[in-house]
Every structure is written in structure tokens, then in C-alpha cells.
């Protein structure tokens, strides 16, 4: 390279820009490398200077400053630095290669001036050297890669070596991106100066001698042809309008026919797509309806079977002289509970039998004071949604009734029933000691499909299973099994039902209970607020053996749950619901609800405080504050669409824009790579970018290898053809957008070329093997060692 006075002046100008705009100390100029200058990803048309720290320091780099292009080309630091790049590295000696690119200095030490140069003491009048607005010169003309290759002829070879040898090298990629940016800025600014001869004519003359092939290029000189083409396009539009105004021409009818044919094709395609979606929706609805019908039929059969079992048990007990509690028409048969409960520890049943034996008279007859603890209690009303609609109004308006109206009969004592039925003088062994006693069938954790079905089946009867919350609140023993053999009547205590116990039972249970009050409480429902949480917080399930040892958290005693449905909508709780501000979370005694004399005469009520699961409201407030926080870039924020299913959807969002919003390409051009993205979904952006980058790569490959031979064909049409090919590749191989992006990323990670075509002659889309899909399209999860 021949160093002239003009080029040496630009060396001094480059040193001034680095010191004045990029805030570099004169002592640090020697240590700066070419890879320390990169294209900024935040501000458009900007450069960032930061020095990489190769040692084991705490910071990966030392940041200097970011500088943007100026609208006034005579004061633009990027333009001056670009001219320096053209002079210094248009034909570098030695050439920049993949072996030495990290050692190339940004400024040659021979040209760094350390003496008192008056130029270096000129103060920068614009301290804010970065801008978020693109200059008009970068928007009026976009140079092609061929023009950039005229400025830096060696750049294409370096990029090819990068793709073949070391495509994952970030420094090498940043260097190629830097010279592409410098070439684009040089072409745009020199073209602007050539159109305005009074601006910096000496620089244009000097660069035209330095790279004459650029100024001889037709595309570079195409401003007049662009104007002529615009005028011709305007004349053509005017001619078409005049032809439409004249109804006698045949061309009008032909054009109208062609327009209507194109419109009919689009409508036909859209109608086919809609009909397919409607057919699929109908099939899905039919399958859901079949599932619902099967569930309803199964529930009816289950309910009818339980009623038949209950009627048989009533007849058997009445034939032996005993009796059970007769319920009104709105209640559930008590024998349904025989399929829902489990016997408790036989150690709990023995004292009950002994206590009842002491209460018997000397003649073996049971007195009227015998409590009804041995009768099975009712299952909770909320376990049967279809029956709760008729029972709940009754509970709200239930009034105290006289003793003679409530029909009830005493259960016979176990000893008398057993002796009367079997005639044996020996009492039968208790069933609770059998190792084959029945057990609860716990509810499975709800799945999204079950939740959707539950919302459709609002009036259906739930499966006769005790949920985990009911199990935690219940101490249960098993009842008699057959009409021929009667055992000691067990104790049934179910959350949500009323039952009276003997003094021994109540004293024994109250010792294990963590609560001091003797009230039976239903478990409060957890809130589900869709505005703050996407999924409700599920409480930690407790094993059956540890339920009695669990104590309610202190936060549930001190802080009421403001998010509970009872506090939000008092009308749903009936007429007797507590108003706001009362202890709505405290257990409500069943005796207060039913007003029955049996509950009033009982010496104690079995107490199990339902464990509450408080949810911190601060968690929801943080989420709301996070969603409503408005930053300085809130006006330009764009949330990536979640409705993209095909490559065409990605193409429309990237290049056209959805719902009248700006396209992603436009957002990148205006605001850079980061500022417009919503932080919550910014991690989805690389999966889309790798697909769109591959489409651009295939466009370039198709042009170079002769697939697209028409030079007048717009790149937009070429891009659409490649989008169609990629969509065909995705459909033929049964890939989703995520699996396709994962396929591209895994190939890139393994330094393998991405290609969807069988060959470059007929350009047919290839088919993937199952081994390829398993290797590249499946996510890998680290297995625990």
C-alpha cells in the first residue's frame, strides 16, 4: 500500500476518532486489535469498541464507547472511520486470514502520533455519540454483496473459510460482520456524495482512484435508472387507470378476469383450509362427547349399584331387630359410605366396644342413652357435585325441628346382634385385626384433560373416591361386612358430617388432635386467580400415616386467606355465610348447621383441623408489578406470536408483520437486536432467527448455483419459493417448528452443513431417516448419575 498524504491524514483522523469519540487513552491505542471493534446490537448503524481480556480477570472485556452515524456526513465519525478502513484494508498486505485475524492491530504503531498534534486537542461537541434513529442514507439504498466485494475483495473468501473451518468462532464472525458494515456504509455515503458534487469532492475523487471498479458499477450509478424506473412505473399505473376508465378495451376484461381468477384461487385455498380445520374440530368434539357419555353412564351404574346395596343392607338390619338412621329425601343413603371408608387401627375399635359393653344393662338390653357413634356417618356433601345443588339450599334454610319429627332408630349393640344372628355365646373377632382390610383409593392428581372434562361435567356425580384432603381429616373404622356375621360396630367420622361419640372416643381422639376446639371443619378451597397465576399452586401431599402428625402452619391461624372464594363471593355460600371480616376460615360446627338434638347431646365432637395452604399475596403483587412496569422502551416492545404453526407464519411475522404491527425485520433495522423484544419471550427469538437465516442462505445458494437465473426476479419471490420448499420439507418429515429449529442448531453445533435438498440439479426436497430425526430433532436431557 502506498502511503500518500491523504491516506496519512486519515490515519490521524482515525486516531482522533478513537480518542475523542470512543474515549480511548493514547497509551491504550497500541494494544487495540481489529477484533475489539464490533457492530453494536442495540443501536442501529453503530460501532462499539471494547477490549477483550484474555487473562483470568473478573471482567471479560473493558468497554470504551458506542458511536453512531451522523446525519451530517461532514461530521460523521463512522464515515471517516470507514474511509480509513477502505484505505487500510481494501487490499491488505499481508492479507487477513483465519490464522492471523486475531493479531491484526486496529492502528499501526508507526502511524500513532504521541506528540502535541493540534488536531487531537479539538473538543468533541457531541458527547452523546450514539443514536437510536437510522440516518436517511442507510434507508435509501441497500448495497448488494457484489458491491461490498468490490470494496473488500478478500471478505467473501474469509467468510467461506469461516463456514467450512470454524463457523462457531464468535470473534471471526464479528470481524466479518464489521467489514460488511464498513463496506455498506462506504458505498451508501460515497453514493450520496456522488449525487451531491459540492460535498467533499476531494474524498470522492481520491476513493474513485483507489477503487475505480466501484464507481464504474451500474448498480452504484443507478440513481438515474431508479428515477426512470419509478417514472415508468408511475406512467404504467396511470395507463392502467385510464384503461379501466375506458370500458371498451379488451385488456380491461382480461385483467379483470385474471384478477378474479387469482382471487378465486386464494379463496378456494382458504376455504379448503377452513373446512379441514372445521372437520378436525367436529371430530374432536365427537370424541369429547363420547368420553362424557361413557363417564355419565359409568356414574349412573355406580350410583344404582350403591343404592341397591343400601336397600339390601336396610332390609337385613331391620330383619334382625336393629335400625339405622333414616334420612330425608334430600340426603344420601348412608350405606353408600361403605364403599368410601376404611377401617382404622383395631386398637381404636376395642375401647369402643368395651365402653359400649359397660353401658349395657344387666339383662343385655341396650338403653335409650346409647349414642349413635357406631352408625356410619354421611359422606361430605361436596364429594357429590350433582347432589350438592339440592342439599345446599336445605342447609341454608334448615331450622330446629322437634324431637318427634326427626325419625331415627337405635342400632343394636354388637354383642346382641352377633348372638341373635349366629346363636354363638362367643363374640366374633374384630375385623380391624385382619391384614386384608380395605383401603382408601386416593384421587389421582388432576391432569389438564381431566380439568377440561370437569368443566364440561358440572352436574355429573364424581367418582366415589375419597380425596386426600378428606383422608387427612377423617378417622374411620370399617362396618359390618355380611348380614350373617356382625362385628363390633366401628366408628365412622368423615369430614363434613355430623356424628356423636362416647366420652372415651372423644377423649382419645382429642388427645391426638392438634386443635383445642371440638369442631368439625371442612377443608377450605384454595384460590385460583387466573389474572395472577397461570397454574394454581398445588399443596404438598402428605402421606396417610403422617396426616395426624401434621400441624397447620402458623400463617393460616394469623392471616385469613383473602383470596378464598368464600371471601370473594358471599352469595355462593348461602344465606348463612359469614360476612367479610369474620373468621370465615375457622371450622364451623355441624351442630350449628343442622341444629339436631343428637349433635347437641353428644359429649364431644371429633376434631380434625383441616390443614390450610396459605398462598402469599406478595407473589402475585410481584407478578402484577412486573407485568405493568413501563420502561423507556415500552412503546416499541413487541411480543413474539404464539400462533405460528408453519414456515409461512414465521415468514409473515418476520418480513410482513402480523395484525398491522411492524415486521421483525423492520424492528431490527430501526431498533437493533434487543430493545424491541419483550424479556419474557426473548429466548424464542433465536429459534426463529436460525430458520430465517437459513432461508437467506438458500436464496444466495440458489442464485450462485443457477437455480434462479433471471436477474430481474425480485429477492422476495426467491424467498417465497424457498419458504415453500422448507415448509414441504417440514411436512414430509413430520417436524414441528421447534424440532426443525433444533435440527438446524444441532447441525450447526456439529459443524455440519444445513441442506434440505437431495441435489442441486432438480432441487428436490429430501427425506430424513429415523436415525437423523432421533439424533438431531430430539432434545437431550442429562440423566442423573
Curated annotation (Swiss-Prot):
GO molecular function: DNA-binding transcription activator activity, RNA polymerase II-specific; DNA-binding transcription factor activity, RNA polymerase II-specific; RNA polymerase II cis-regulatory region sequence-specific DNA binding
Keywords on record: Activator, DNA-binding, Nucleus, Phosphoprotein, Transcription, Transcription regulation
Region spans: Leucine-zipper: 267-299
One of the record's GO cellular component terms: nucleus
Protein's GO biological process: negative regulation of transcription by RNA polymerase II; nucleosome organization; positive regulation of ribosomal protein gene transcription by RNA polymerase II; positive regulation of transcription by RNA polymerase II; positive regulation of transcription from a mobile element promoter; regulation of glycolytic process
Protein name per the record: Glycolytic genes transcriptional activator GCR1
Bias-annotated ranges (Low complexity): 493-504
Pfam families: GCR1_C
Amino acid at each position: 500500500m502506498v502511503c500518500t498524504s491523504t491516506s496519512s491524514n486519515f490515519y490521524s483522523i482515525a486516531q482522533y476518532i478513537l480518542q475523542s469519540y470512543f474515549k480511548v487513552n493514547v497509551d491504550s491505542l497500541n494494544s487495540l486489535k481489529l477484533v475489539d471493534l464490533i457492530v453494536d446490537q442495540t443501536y442501529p448503524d453503530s460501532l462499539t469498541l471494547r477490549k477483550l481480556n484474555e487473562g483470568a480477570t473478573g471482567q471479560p472485556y473493558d468497554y470504551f464507547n458506542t458511536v453512531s452515524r451522523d446525519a451530517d456526513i461532514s461530521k460523521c465519525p463512522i464515515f471517516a472511520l470507514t474511509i480509513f478502513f477502505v484505505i487500510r484494508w481494501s487490499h491488505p498486505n499481508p492479507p487477513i486470514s483465519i490464522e492471523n485475524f486475531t493479531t491484526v492491530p486496529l492502528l499501526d504503531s508507526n502511524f500513532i502520533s504521541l506528540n502535541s498534534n493540534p488536531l487531537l486537542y479539538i473538543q468533541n461537541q457531541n458527547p452523546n455519540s450514539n443514536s437510536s434513529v437510522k440516518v436517511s442514507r442507510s434507508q435509501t439504498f441497500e448495497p448488494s454483496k457484489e458491491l461490498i466485494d468490490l470494496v473488500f475483495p478478500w471478505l467473501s473468501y474469509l467468510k467461506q473459510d469461516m463456514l467450512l473451518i470454524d463457523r462457531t468462532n464468535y470473534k471471526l464472525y464479528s470481524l466479518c460482520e464489521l467489514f460488511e458494515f464498513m463496506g455498506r456504509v462506504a458505498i451508501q455515503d460515497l453514493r450520496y456524495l456522488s449525487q451531491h458534487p459540492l460535498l467533499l469532492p476531494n474524498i470522492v475523487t481520491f476513493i474513485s482512484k483507489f477503487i475505480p471498479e466501484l464507481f464504474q458499477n451500474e448498480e452504484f450509478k443507478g440513481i438515474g435508472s431508479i428515477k426512470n424506473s419509478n417514472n415508468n412505473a408511475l406512467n404504467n399505473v396511470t395507463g392502467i387507470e385510464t384503461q379501466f376508465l375506458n370500458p371498451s378495451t379488451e385488456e380491461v376484461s382480461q385483467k379483470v378476469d385474471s384478477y378474479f381468477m387469482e382471487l378465486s384461487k386464494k379463496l378456494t385455498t382458504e376455504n379448503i383450509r377452513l373446512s379441514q380445520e372445521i372437520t378436525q374440530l367436529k371430530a374432536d368434539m365427537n370424541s369429547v362427547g363420547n368420553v362424557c357419555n361413557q363417564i355419565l353412564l359409568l356414574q349412573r351404574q355406580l350410583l344404582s349399584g350403591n343404592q341397591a346395596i343400601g336397600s339390601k343392607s336396610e332390609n337385613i338390619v331391620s330383619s334382625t331387630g336393629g335400625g339405622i338412621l333414616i334420612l330425608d329425601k334430600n340426603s344420601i343413603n348412608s350405606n353408600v359410605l361403605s364403599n368410601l371408608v376404611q377401617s382404622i387401627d383395631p386398637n381404636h375399635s376395642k375401647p369402643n366396644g368395651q365402653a359400649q359393653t359397660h353401658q349395657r344393662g344387666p339383662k343385655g338390653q341396650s338403653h335409650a342413652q346409647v349414642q349413635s357413634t357406631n352408625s356410619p356417618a354421611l359422606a361430605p356433601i361436596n364429594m357429590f357435585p350433582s347432589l350438592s345443588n339440592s342439599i345446599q339450599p336445605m342447609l341454608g334454610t334448615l331450622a330446629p325441628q322437634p324431637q318427634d319429627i326427626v325419625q331415627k332408630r337405635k342400632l343394636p349393640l354388637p354383642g346382641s346382634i352377633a348372638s341373635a344372628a349366629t346363636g354363638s355365646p362367643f363374640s366374633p373377632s374384630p375385623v380391624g385385626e385382619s391384614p386384608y382390610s380395605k383401603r382408601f383409593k386416593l384421587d389421582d392428581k388432576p391432569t389438564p384433560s381431566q380439568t377440561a372434562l370437569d368443566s364440561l361435567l358440572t352436574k355429573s356425580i364424581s367418582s366415589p373416591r375419597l380425596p386426600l384432603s378428606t383422608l387427612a381429616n377423617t378417622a374411620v373404622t370399617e362396618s359390618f361386612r355380611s348380614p350373617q356375621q356382625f362385628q363390633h360396630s366401628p366408628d365412622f367420622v368423615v369430614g363434613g358430617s355430623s356424628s356423636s361419640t362416647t366420652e372415651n372416643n372423644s377423649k382419645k381422639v382429642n388427645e391426638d388432635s392438634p386443635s383445642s376446639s371440638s369442631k368439625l371443619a371442612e377443608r377450605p378451597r384454595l384460590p385460583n386467580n387466573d389474572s395472577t397465576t397461570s397454574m394454581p399452586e398445588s399443596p404438598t401431599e402428605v402421606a396417610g400415616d403422617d396426616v395426624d402428625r401434621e400441624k397447620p402452619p402458623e400463617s393460616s391461624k394469623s392471616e385469613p386467606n383473602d383470596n378464598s372464594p368464600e371471601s370473594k363471593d358471599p352469595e355462593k355460600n348461602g344465606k348463612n355465610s359469614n360476612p367479610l371480616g369474620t373468621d370465615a376460615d375457622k371450622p364451623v360446627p355441624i351442630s350449628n348447621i343442622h341444629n339436631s338434638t343428637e349433635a347437641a347431646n353428644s359429649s364431644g365432637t371429633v376434631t380434625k383441623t383441616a390443614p390450610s395452604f396459605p398462598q402469599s399475596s406478595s407473589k402475585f403483587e410481584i407478578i402484577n408489578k412486573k407485568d405493568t412496569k413501563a420502561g423507556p422502551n415500552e412503546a416499541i416492545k413487541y411480543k413474539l406470536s404464539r400462533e405460528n404453526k408453519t414456515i409461512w407464519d414465521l415468514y409473515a411475522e418476520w418480513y410482513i408483520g402480523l395484525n398491522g404491527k411492524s415486521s421483525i425485520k423492520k424492528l431490527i433495522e430501526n431498533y437493533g437486536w434487543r430493545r424491541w423484544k419483550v424479556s419474557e419471550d426473548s429466548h424464542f427469538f433465536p429459534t426463529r432467527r436460525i430458520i430465517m437465516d437459513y432461508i437467506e442462505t438458500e436464496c444466495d445458494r440458489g442464485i450462485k448455483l443457477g437455480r434462479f437465473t433471471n436477474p430481474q426476479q425480485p429477492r422476495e419471490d426467491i424467498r417465497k419459493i424457498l419458504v415453500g420448499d422448507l415448509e414441504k420439507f417440514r411436512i414430509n418429515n413430520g417436524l414441528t417448528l421447534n424440532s426443525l429449529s433444533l435440527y438446524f442448531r444441532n447441525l450447526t453445533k456439529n459443524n455440519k452443513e444445513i441442506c434440505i435438498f437431495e441435489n442441486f440439479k432438480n432441487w428436490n426436497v429430501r427425506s430424513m431417516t429415523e436415525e437423523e430425526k432421533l439424533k438431531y430433532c430430539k432434545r437431550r436431557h442429562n440423566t442423573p448419575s
